[in-house]
Amino acid sequence: MRTGFANPTRPRRFLLAAALGTCLLPVLAPAAAADLLDTVKARGVLRIGLEGTYPPFNFKDPKTGQLNGYDADVARLVCKRLGVRPEFVSTEWPAILAGLGAGKYDVIISQVGITAQRRQAFDFSQPYTYSAPQLIVRRNETANYARLEDLKGRRLGVGQGSVFEQQAKAVPGIDVRSYPAAPENLQDLAFGRIDAALNDSLMVAYLLKNSRLPIRAGARVGAVERMGIAFRKGNPKFQAAVDAALAAARADGSLKQVSIKWFGVDASRAP
């Protein structure tokens, strides 16, 4: 496994309920506040929260020091169509939603999953990424893990604070092992300390491409997930403008081009 790549600490980014609850109060903006679109246009800058350590989605290029990746490219596409420039604010994942609620940035473009729980606190653009949960197993694995229920009595590695952790813990009998970073659970998988790992299908392809460990892709074991741009509630003009920007990028093929560049497939459309 290549050990030099940045720390992909989480699969497709979903916070635990407790973390979400801490940022509910600051999210509610006064009714009379200006729409975010007017604020951003006047400023000429869209402040974008992202982790910056999650390749190939968002990471700092070691050669240039600039933020790069799929999310960063999507952000630049949106900003170009809004007529503003992007300003990236690197934020640790556990604090990223709270930072949005506190106004540290205008949006999050960092693989934030669209869930009913999150919609109670934030608004979202239309989805710009679609993927699904997928297992990683040892190369010589003979057991047939076709669904999560097949892992009852087995040890499953997941990312801390991820939707995959929640999904795994919802299945009685799975011995769920939580890890702060993907490299650790893949090492444990290769050496037999866990029986499988669960991650996002797009991330699985990236991890395997950059790993020399004796592991391989397993079955997809869940529904398709949708990722969108998150922002504070009460900004209908901004939401319409961002959705229009994404629709235009999808229509002219530029969003697909960015996805192909990073993943080799078009992850911007539902399968």
Over which residues does each language-model region extend?
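Extracytoplasmic small-molecule ligand-binding "clamshell" domains
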Residues: 33-111, 120, 252
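Alpha-to-beta junction loops
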Residues: 46-47, 83-85, 102-110, 154-155, ...
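Ligand-binding cleft/hinge of the Venus flytrap
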Residues: 58-64, 75-84, 147-148, 161-180, ...
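Short helix-initiation/N-cap motifs at beta->coil->alpha
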Residues: 72, 88-98, 143, 162, ...
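Flexible hinge/capping segments at coil-to-helix
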Residues: 139-155
